[in-house]
């Protein structure tokens, strides 16, 4: 055989395995399959906001943005948002917590004192707001937004009093009139009564979000997974996207919510401070898992419209009044 032809034949053989390896590698870097389950923006009506360099919030109905809020002059990032039944929006954006009317008028604002941060806030009726103030010490506060007076205040433990940013991101009130707090730097979730007494706690790896369920259990977002646990600490179910849905690259879980049909909505945050978004291969912003861990809806909207990173969502398919909660005798 001609030596040159032999060399060409050998090169062809050696390149064949390389080509077969490169193609799957390209597929493995995809953030999600090309065809996504569900109806996109039209799947649900919902409130959407996220930790981003832009403080924006959106209300989506029937697949369209019907209301949006932009706070270009503000500081921080929106970590929490709650849409009240009267249309007002409560947001916590690190350096302040504020209540905004449907006409985008700021009805009430409270700035975080120097050296502190506010990442989570909850309405109690129409007159009170509970918020958690990261700091040294870290505090749970309930303020009357009509009078400006503090109704309740107590300190809560933290792992690192000086590491203000890493203390808390999320808390929620339960039907028992208690407060659930995800202690990120203590690797646990705690339940407090209105006096500040710890009622119970659950060990967690890196808890970001916590959601009380109607059955009395709670959802803990442990960053790599979402666990439903009982009050006694028994794990009822676990969703681990990296193994349960490996085709979807979900690397930064923050919050999860149980939908009325039993499915679980999970957000997937993109860190704008950690890198530039690849708009040719953007990550999903949220997914819905069935109880048997099938994905039935995926939200990925980075253009037309660009919703930005996802942190918090509130499904609006049915009328609700999230302000109808209590903290002890505060209603």
Predicted features by range, described:
Residues 26-331:
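Histidine-/acidic-rich catalytic cores in large beta-rich domains
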Residues 17-19, 128:
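Hydrophobic alpha-helical elements and their junctions with loops/disorder across both membrane
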Residues 19-21, 25:
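Boundary at the C-terminal end of the N-terminal hydrophobic targeting segment
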Residues 1-8:
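Bacterial N-terminal signal peptides that target proteins for export
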Residues 8-17:
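Bacterial N-terminal signal peptides
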């Amino acid at each position: 055989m001609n030596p040159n032809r032999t060399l060409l034949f050998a090169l062809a053989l050696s390149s064949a395995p390389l080509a077969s390896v490169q193609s799957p590698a390209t597929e493995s870097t995809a953030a999600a399959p090309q065809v996504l389950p569900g109806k996109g923006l039209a799947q649900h009506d919902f409130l959407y906001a996220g930790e981003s360099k832009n403080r924006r919030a959106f209300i989506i109905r029937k697949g369209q943005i019907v209301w949006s809020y932009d706070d270009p002059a503000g500081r921080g990032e929106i970590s929490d948002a709650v849409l009240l039944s009267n249309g007002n929006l409560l947001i916590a954006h690190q350096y302040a917590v504020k209540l905004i009317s449907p006409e985008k008028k700021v009805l009430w604002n409270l700035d975080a004192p120097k050296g502190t941060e506010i990442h989570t806030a909850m309405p109690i009726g129409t007159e009170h707001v509970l918020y958690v103030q990261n700091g040294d010490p870290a505090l749970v506060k309930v303020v009357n937004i009509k009078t400006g007076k503090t109704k309740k205040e107590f300190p809560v433990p933290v792992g690192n009093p000086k590491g203000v940013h890493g203390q808390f991101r999320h808390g929620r009130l339960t039907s028992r009139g208690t407060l659930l707090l995800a202690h990120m730097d203590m690797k646990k979730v705690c339940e407090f009564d209105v006096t500040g007494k710890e009622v119970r706690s659950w060990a967690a790896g890196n808890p970001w979000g916590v959601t009380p369920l109607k059955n009395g259990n709670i959802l803990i977002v442990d960053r790599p997974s979402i666990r439903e646990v009982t009050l006694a600490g028994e794990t009822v179910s676990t969703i681990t996207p990296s193994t349960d849905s490996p085709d979807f690259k979900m690397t930064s879980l923050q919050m999860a919510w149980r939908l009325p049909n039993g499915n679980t909505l999970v957000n997937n945050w993109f860190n704008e401070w950690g890198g530039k978004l690849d708009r040719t291969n953007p990550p999903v912003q949220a997914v819905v898992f069935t109880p048997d861990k099938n994905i039935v809806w995926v939200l990925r909207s980075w253009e037309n419209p660009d919703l930005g990173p996802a942190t918090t969502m509130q499904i609006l398919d049915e009328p609700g009044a999230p302000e109808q909660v209590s903290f002890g005798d505060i209603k």
